[in-house]
């Protein structure tokens, strides 16, 4: 999975945690 802070797109499930919609980056926790 992608590390925290990595740019992500809405609807993607590639983050280790989840994607922040307002910043389009993976959450830290």
From Swiss-Prot:
| Cysteine disulfide links | 1-16, 8-19, 15-26
GO cellular component terms, alphabetically, are:
extracellular region; host cell presynaptic membrane
Q: In which tissues is it expressed?
A: Expressed by the venom duct.
MF terms (GO), sorted A to Z: calcium channel regulator activity; ion channel inhibitor activity; toxin activity
Organism domain of life: Eukaryota
Q: Tell me yes or no: is Secreted among this UniProt entry's keywords.
A: yes
- What InterPro entries does the entry give? Conotoxin_omega-typ_CS
Q: Give the location in the cell.
A: Secreted
Q: Does the keyword Zinc apply?
A: no
> Where 4-hydroxyproline occurs along the chain?
4, 7
Keyword vocabulary terms for this entry: Calcium channel impairing toxin, Disulfide bond, Hydroxylation, Ion channel impairing toxin, Knottin, Neurotoxin, Presynaptic neurotoxin, Secreted, Toxin, Voltage-gated calcium channel impairing toxin
Function comment: Omega-conotoxins act at presynaptic membranes, they bind and block voltage-gated calcium channels (Cav).
The UniProt record's further free-text remark is:
The sequence shown is that of conotoxin GVIIA.
What is recorded about the domains?
The presence of a 'disulfide through disulfide knot' structurally defines this protein as a knottin. The cysteine framework is VI/VII (C-C-CC-C-C).
User: What protein is this chain from?
Assistant: Omega-conotoxins GVIIA/GVIIB
């Amino acid at each position: 999975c992608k590390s925290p802070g990595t740019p992500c797109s809405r609807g993607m499930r590639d983050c280790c945690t989840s994607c922040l919609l307002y910043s389009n980056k993976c959450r830290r926790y």
